[in-house]
C-alpha cells in the first residue's frame, strides 16, 4: 500500500525533465541525515492509480515526467502503478527514487521506469553530484538496457 504526503514540480531530479515528484510516506530506510524524516511515518493519503493519474493530468501541460519518491516499503506497488501510468499516459516518463542499494526481486516482473535512483543517503558520500556518492541514477531504455547517468549531475 502506498501513501503520499505531498507533491511538487521539480527540475533537478532527472536530467532534461520537468518532474511531478510525489513524496511517499512509510519509508523503512530512516537514513541518518535524511532531509525528509517526516516521510518515515505512516501518514498521508492512499495513492492508487486513479489518484496518480489525476495528479499527472492536473499538471500535464507542465511536466514531462512523474516520479515516486520513496516506496521502499512496497516496491511492487511502485512498479505496478508506474507501469500502469505509462500505459495510460504514453508520452510521460516515469521515475523512482529508492533508498535501497539493490533493486527488489520483483523488479524484472514489470516494465522498468524510465529512471531509477538507488542508494541510501549517506552524508559522508554526498548527493548524486558528488564524485564520492554511493547513490546511482539509471536510465532504462525501451530495449531493457540500462545506463548509469549519475555523471550527468556532476559539474564539468
Labelled PLM ranges:
Residues 1-23, 28, 36-41, 154-156:
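N-terminal [4Fe-4S]-dependent radical SAM core
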Residues 2-10, 36-94, 102-106:
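Conserved Radical SAM active-site core
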Residues 20, 37-38, 81-84, 109-111, ...:
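Short, glycine/charged-enriched secondary-structure capping and boundary segments
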Residues 29, 61, 110-111:
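Structured loop/turn residues at beta-strand edges in well-structured enzyme cores
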Residues 70, 98, 141:
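Short beta-strand/turn micro-motifs composed of small residues
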Residues 98-100, 119-120:
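Short secondary-structure boundary segments
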Residues 107-156:
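Classical nucleotidyltransferase
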Amino acid at each position: 500500500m502506498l501513501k503520499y504526503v505531498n507533491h511538487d514540480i521539480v527540475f533537478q531530479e532527472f536530467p532534461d525533465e520537468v518532474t511531478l515528484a510525489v513524496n511517499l510516506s512509510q519509508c523503512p530506510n530512516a537514513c541518518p541525515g535524511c532531509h525528509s524524516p517526516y516521510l518515515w511515518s505512516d501518514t498521508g493519503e492512499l495513492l492508487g492509480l486513479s489518484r496518480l493519474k489525476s495528479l499527472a493530468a492536473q499538471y500535464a501541460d507542465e511536466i514531462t515526467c512523474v516520479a515516486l519518491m520513496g516506496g521502499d516499503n512496497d516496491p511492487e506497488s511502485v512498479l505496478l502503478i508506474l507501469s500502469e501510468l505509462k500505459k495510460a499516459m504514453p508520452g510521460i516518463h516515469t521515475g523512482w527514487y529508492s533508498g535501497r542499494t539493490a533493486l527488489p526481486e520483483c523488479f524484472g516482473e514489470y516494465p522498468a521506469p524510465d529512471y531509477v535512483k538507488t542508494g541510501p543517503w549517506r552524508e559522508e558520500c554526498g548527493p548524486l553530484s558528488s564524485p564520492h556518492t554511493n547513490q546511482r541514477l539509471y536510465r532504462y531504455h525501451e530495449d531493457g538496457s540500462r545506463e548509469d547517468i549519475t555523471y550527468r549531475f556532476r559539474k564539468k
